[in-house]
Amino acid sequence: MRQKLDRLLEQAQINLTDQQKEQLVGFVRLLDKWNKAYNLTSVRNPDEMLVKHILDSLVVSEHLQGNNFIDVGTGPGLPGIPLAIANPDKQFVLLDSLGKRITFIKNALRELGITNVTPVLSRVEEYKEQTFDGVLSRAFASLNDMVDWCYHLPNPQGKFYALKGIYAESEVQEIKNPIWLEKVIPLSVPELVGERHLVLLNKPN
């Protein structure tokens, strides 16, 4: 699996240390193991997880601006854990409303020695502890849902980072809250079939 990860990272032009690579491989192994009992992801094959979960998360890394981020509807820690491994200088809150997912994340953090992640079991609308430089998610079906549920989370300079498959302009027009579209970045994920986009949105100051 490590060789496959090395190859994918090289194709994506992402530079990581050996320790970071071992943490990513360890995370996939844990996800594969826990998935058999807890059904955390529909992706069953560890090699596929490297593409659809790890690389799909890591390609966002170079676009992150700021130091503290929240991953809303993180599921088993995606994109939060791969991004936290790749950015040990940044802090990540991983939010999910399902206990088994947070239990898995806590276990993974402990086993992999990841110290820059705080897992939180909560519904997003009830989480009011702090604001963030970036609100990340690949969980929401629509941009309107993401902005609506998470509108209280960015700080005044903060952004929404929506990880999407196909991007449709009409989705931005459907957003009810005041928002402006900063940019849409096409993402290239090695060996992934289909389009990926990162949509950056800002609240007006």
From Swiss-Prot:
Enzyme type, top EC level: transferase
Pfam families documented for this protein: GidB (PF02527)
UniProt entry keywords in alphabetical sequence: Cytoplasm, Methyltransferase, rRNA processing, S-adenosyl-L-methionine, Transferase
Molecular function per GO: rRNA (guanine-N7-)-methyltransferase activity
EC number from the UniProt entry: 2.1.1.170
Residue sites binding S-adenosyl-L-methionine per the record: G73, L78, V124, E125, R138
GO cellular component, one term: cytosol
Subcellular location(s) of the protein: Cytoplasm
Superkingdom of origin: Bacteria
Task performed by this protein: Specifically methylates the N7 position of guanine in position 527 of 16S rRNA.
Family of this protein: Belongs to the methyltransferase superfamily. RNA methyltransferase RsmG family.
The name this protein goes by in its record: Ribosomal RNA small subunit methyltransferase G
Organism encoding this protein: Actinobacillus pleuropneumoniae serotype 3 (strain JL03)
